[in-house]
Curated annotation (Swiss-Prot):
InterPro entries in the cross-refs: EF-G-like_DII, EFG_III/V, G_TR_CS, P-loop_NTPase, PrfC, RF3_C, RF3_dom_3_sf, RF3_GTP-bd
Family: Belongs to the TRAFAC class translation factor GTPase superfamily. Classic translation factor GTPase family. PrfC subfamily.
A Gene Ontology cellular-component term: cytosol
Superkingdom of this protein's organism: Bacteria
Species lineage: Bacteria, Pseudomonadati, Pseudomonadota, Gammaproteobacteria, Enterobacterales
Protein's name according to its UniProt entry: Peptide chain release factor 3
One of the record's GO molecular function terms: GTPase activity
Length: 529
């Protein structure tokens, strides 16, 4: 393959994730994006039980029952001249670690905001994570077919709460039952909305020019006058779009629309392929790797069990950073130092897998894994280096796991260790007893673990409260002092799934006191994989 062909393949890749608060419409927007990418023919809307058309990207049993996306799916589709990789992140209240780690594998994010509610808690948290890497953000103000807050007010809220400048690209005309469409500030065109066309791609009527009398006829004189008035204000008070500020993560272009009505999604996609960066360079512990390099490198950011219920398999999701993946390629797994031949990597359309012959930087490929691959693993063509910045977060919630049948202790431990390698939950084994404590960043994770232990490992377990409120990974360069610390705090020490030592504190007060007492011991809130 010639260098120019390789460069062309790299330059057309766009890899992004969607971040939002639960119920802001993330799964619906994912569906509509796939519809525009011709990846699906009609969009199934996410509803509670009873509706048979399940959304394409929600595929684990529990997700189908609850109408929420629990695991991160990966979908690739063509749009315009680009190939887009969309990483779907769980939108539900408390899915987190998976989501945080997924954000380390993308070059850009789409923030979906419910325009009736504005900035919500979950969005704030996710934005903090994107800030760690200054990821560029596009914004979609959703649900304009309902009654929303004043758009100017919502933009102000985004700017003040998320500390990012907003540059409106389109502007809404009316909302709720009076929603008529949007005006594009940079193309000087109005796109008119028709109701009831949400499941397919609709032909949109376009009115050129803001002073066109046709506009008054189409949306009514009152709304047309209101639009012109609002635009005067918008042009005076808001930021203009600047590509450099967007790429630095300082400014977000804002699009208005309704994902359910399939309106405005294509404007956002046009912005994404035009402005979002092609695959970006990444740091390793020795140097920076750019997408232009011909030698293959990649890192694993997620492990998912049982995408295929018929086989008890696990799939490791790897982001390609540089080079071209080819079938039966020999790669070095840096952590173990072993060379492995990867003959059957997968590409995804949530849950439907197909084997791939090649992949380029920005693409996500799936590797079959029988427990040998861990989150954070780096694969290269022989170079010894490790990609950095794939964090493990200290859990905020803890439960003790107990068996209904005490004879199944071995299966329980195996199940929990596998689930912890996958990042579904973190496991802590106290040094002084045989308890198994699981830590999570959100309550729903405990239900998921119990459900999966039952379906995948045939283990009936229940969880109960435990006197732990937080955990920190501990280390100390002074061996003697560390031994003393371990001896005196044995009751509060545990090993995690990767056998790293952690201090599990009953209260924050206890943690702070212990910290003061042992200044030479470092207490880490995150741990690199």
């Amino acid at each position: 393959m010639s260098p120019s062909e390789y460069a062309r393949e790299v330059s057309k890749r766009r890899t992004f994730a969607i971040i939002s608060h639960p119920d802001a419409g993330k799964t619906t927007i994912t569906e509509k994006v796939l519809l525009f990418g011709q990846a699906i023919q009609t969009a199934g809307t996410v509803k509670g039980r009873g509706s048979n058309q399940h959304a394409k990207s929600d595929w684990m049993e529990m997700e189908k029952q609850r109408g929420i996306s629990i695991t991160t799916s990966v979908m690739q589709f063509p749009y315009r001249e680009c190939l887009v990789n969309l990483l779907d992140t769980p939108g539900h209240e408390d899915f987190s670690e998976d989501t945080y780690r997924t954000l380390t594998a993308v070059d850009c994010c789409l923030m979906v905001i419910d325009a009736a509610k504005g900035v919500e808690d979950r969005t704030r948290k996710l934005m903090e994570v994107t800030r760690l890497r200054d990821t560029p953000i596009l914004t979609f103000m959703n649900k304009l077919d309902r009654d929303i807050r004043d758009p100017m007010e919502v933009l102000d809220e985004v700017e003040s709460e998320l500390k990012i400048a907003c540059a409106p690209i389109t502007w809404p005309i009316g909302c709720g039952k009076l929603f008529k469409g949007v005006y594009h500030l940079y193309k000087d065109e109005t796109y008119l909305y028709q109701t009831g066309k949400g499941h397919t791609i609709q032909e949109v009527r376009i009115v050129k020019g803001l002073d066109n009398p046709e506009l008054d006829t189409a949306v009514g004189e009152e709304l047309a006058a209101q639009l012109r008035e609002e635009l005067e204000l918008v042009k005076g008070a808001s930021h203009e779009f600047e590509l450099d500020a967007f790429l630095a993560g300082e400014l977000t272009p804002v699009f208005f629309g309704t994902a359910l009505g399939n309106f405005g999604v294509d404007h956002m996609l046009d912005g994404l392929v035009a402005w979002a960066p092609a695959p970006m360079p990444r740091k390793t512990d020795t140097r920076e790797v750019t997408a232009a390099e011909e030698k293959f490198t990649g890192f694993v950011f997620k492990i998912q069990a049982n995408m295929d219920p018929k086989h008890r398999d696990r799939v490791a999701f790897m982001r390609v950073v540089s080079g071209r993946y080819e079938k039966s390629m020999k790669l070095r797994q840096v952590r173990t130092g072993k060379d492995v031949v990867i003959s059957d990597a997968l590409t995804f359309m949530a849950g439907d897998r197909s084997h791939i012959e090649e992949a380029y930087p920005g693409d996500i490929i799936g590797l079959h894994n029988h427990g040998t691959i861990q989150i954070g693993d780096t694969f290269t063509q022989g170079e010894d280096m490790k990609f950095t910045g794939i964090p493990n977060f200290a859990p905020e919630l803890f439960r003790r796991i107990r068996l209904r049948d005490p004879l199944k202790q071995k299966q329980l431990l195996k199940g929990l260790v596998q689930l912890s390698e996958e990042g579904a939950v973190q496991v802590f084994r106290p040094l002084t007893n045989n308890d198994l404590i699981v830590g999570a960043v959100g309550v729903l994770q405990f239900d998921v673990v119990v459900a999966r232990l039952k379906t995948e490992y045939n283990v009936e377990a229940i969880y109960e409260s435990v006197n732990v409120s937080t955990a920190r990974w501990v280390e100390c360069s002074d061996v003697k002092k560390f031994e003393e610390f371990k001896r005196k705090n044995e009751l509060h020490l545990a090993l995690d799934g990767g056998d790293n030592l952690a201090y599990v504190a009953p209260t924050m007060v206890n943690l702070n006191l212990t910290r003061e007492r042992y200044p030479e011991v470092t207490f880490h809130q995150t741990r690199e994989h």
